Amino acid sequence: MLFQNDETMEFLKALIRIGEVSSVDASKATARVVFDDFDSVVSYDLQVICRNTFANRDYAMPDIGEDVICLFLPTGTEAGFILGSVYAGDVTPPENTVNRRCVEFLDGAKFMYDRSAHALTITIGDTAITVNQDAVAVESKNTIQAKVG
């Protein structure tokens, strides 16, 4: 074991925790997390780490029930951050290759970029739009409208 000192190990366990989101405050970009390994204690509002928050802004909140990794300040469990989500249990990633970046939504909508094929595909229901360096392809069981100029 890397840490032989029990006190140090307990300190680290208090700083870094894995829990499940129990509520979300979308307007403040915060969430509360329940920690089953700490007698189901619920955290205070924790800030959700975002990629950008100034000139470029990114926004994505975890869902209630989502497993997350949290980091707390050394001053206690009143202030901390949700660093991100982790796949656990029956929940699996929407892709299984390092060449694709994918965002899949609950309703099945999907944004996927394949860097090996240099192609971006957006799928919503039965409609798929694929853009690469040579063409734009639209497939749909419904009406397709295009406007130039």
Residue ranges and their predicted role:
Residues L2-N5, Y59, D63-D67, L73-G149:
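Right-handed beta-helix
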Residues S27-V33:
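Short aromatic-glycine-enriched beta-strand elements
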Residues M1-R17:
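Short boundary/loop segments of OB/S1/cold-shock single-stranded nucleic-acid-binding domains
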Residues V42-Y59:
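Beta-strand/loop nucleic-acid-binding surfaces
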Residues V33-Y44, R101, F105-D107:
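Short solvent-exposed strand/turn elements
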Residues G19, D36, C50-R51:
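Helix-turn-helix-like N-terminal two-helix hairpins of bacterial/phage DNA-binding regulators
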Residues V21-S23, I82:
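Conserved hydrophobic positions within beta-strands
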